[in-house]
Amino acid sequence: KALPELAGKLTGSSIRVPTPDVSIAILNLTLANDTTKDQVNTYLREMSLHSGIRKQVDYIDSPEVVSTDFVGSRRTGIVDGLATIADGVHLVLYIWYDNEFGYSCQVVRVMEEMAAVHPPTYPAAEPETAAAPGV
């Protein structure tokens, strides 16, 4: 109801897993065009590394992770690439999240955006300097 333009295109559920802080959301999407698991995962991996939402979305494709690995994550969600299912226009994504600390971090990000306040992150990047000749 909050996003009427997504009516009939998105359903989802969230499962509380047996840890104090971590849950998983399962998104069932209907896309406009056919896609493959590799295309989706490549796109989501790149978004998690190089886009403006990289502080919000992370990507993992390791069979070694367990739910407690995500406790304390600042990300809004961590896409589980191994669980991605793509079948034509139908896509299922599994997204882990810390439903306490991660949620709190997202509230802070939303408030910063609403107030147009973006505090610096530390450590600040050092300006590049030219190396001395012969070094």
Regions found by a protein language model. Give the residues of each.
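C-terminal substrate-binding/catalytic lobe of Rossmann-fold NAD(P)-dependent oxidoreductases
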Residues: 1-91
